[in-house]
Design a protein with these regions (language model features):
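Hydrophobic, small-residue-rich alpha-helical packing segments that form membrane-like cores
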Residues: 63-75, 79-148, 153-157
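Short, small-residue-biased leader/transition segments that mark boundaries at the very start
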Residues: 1-8
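Mid-bilayer segments of alpha-helical transmembrane spans in multi-pass integral membrane proteins
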Residues: 50, 54, 63-67, 98-106, ...
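Juxtamembrane membrane-interface segments at transmembrane alpha-helix termini
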Residues: 41, 81-88, 102-109, 167-168, ...
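Membrane-interfacial helix-loop connectors
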Residues: 17-18, 24-52, 58-67, 75-79, ...
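Transmembrane alpha-helical segments and their short flanking loops
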Residues: 104, 115-127, 189-250
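Alpha-helical transmembrane segments of multi-pass membrane proteins, especially transporters
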Residues: 11-15, 26, 40-49, 93-101, ...
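Interfacial helix-loop-helix linkers and transmembrane-helix boundary segments
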Residues: 39, 84-91, 191-201
Length: 250
């Protein structure tokens, strides 16, 4: 009996908590395959997952990764040195969230040596004039590592380092949102037609959104630049706002 309007906010919160839209979408595919969710309900959840996944990029923008190790330590302490079940569960959450942000920090740091490679810098500088190539790069990289949060974290690092301008970064961001749909597609391969429709709808949402944003790339870039100047956003937060705007509009 879950309505579309109920499904959307529930899934936004759920995705924000587990930090994985792909994980939520795979669960949805399984529930639809088992007949526990209708296609309409599933679409509402997928839409919510797309919005909920933007929370990670905002957390990176707030530099929460700087506190990853203390959070991991606190989570481990609650998990291994307390006998209270609620504290154990809280410890699992803190340990997992801290681990995610520690890993994202490591990936961001791994990009640092590339900033001194002239060929790499020159190639990235051309992407502002080749948005379709940016989409392909974003989609391909996200399909490869199965995490849009990770690729967007890398993108935030590249943009903050001045290796990409905003018009070059945005198509990669759009591609990341297409690439993240591969997990649902793979999960639906052995499922029934209803589950395949959910995966197809997920792909369709993000592809249509990307095509529209590419057509409107100049005004979309101007909008994000306006957010940046009016709100005084850091480069990382600028990408986070772009990610949020894309998924909410989508």
């Amino acid at each position: 009996t879950l309505s579309l309007h109920d499904a959307l906010p529930i899934c936004i919160v759920m995705t924000a908590l587990i930090q994985s839209s792909s994980g939520v979408t795979v669960i949805v595919v399984g529930l639809v395959s088992a007949g526990l969710l209708s296609l309409r309900q599933a679409i509402g959840i997928v839409m919510g997952a797309n919005i909920g996944t933007t929370v990670t990029s905002f957390m990176i923008g707030f530099k929460l990764g700087d506190y990853a190790l203390p959070v991991i330590f606190l989570g481990a302490a609650l998990l291994f040195f307390t006998s209270n079940k609620k504290l154990n569960n809280l410890g699992r959450i803190l340990f997992g969230v801290g681990g995610i942000f520690f890993a994202l920090n490591l990936m961001g740091d791994a990009v640092e040596p590339l900033k001194s490679v002239t060929a790499f810098k020159d190639y990235l500088a051309t992407l502002g004039n080749r948005p379709i190539m940016g989409v392909i790069i974003g989609a391909g990289l996200t399909m490869l590592i199965q995490s849009s949060a990770a690729t967007i974290g890398i993108l935030q690092s590249l943009y903050s380092g001045g290796l990409l301008d905003l018009q070059g970064a945005l198509p990669i961001l759009f591609g990341d949102n297409i690439g993240t749909t591969i997990t649902a597609v793979l999960a639906a391969l052995g499922s029934n037609i209803a589950a395949k429709r959910v995966a197809g709808a997920h792909v369709l949402f993000n592809v249509i959104g990307t095509v529209l944003c590419l057509i409107l790339l100049v005004p979309f870039t101007a909008l994000i630049q306006w957010f940046k100047s009016v709100l005084g956003l850091t480069p990382e937060m600028t990408i986070a706002f772009a990610h949020g705007t894309f998924n909410i509009a989508n």
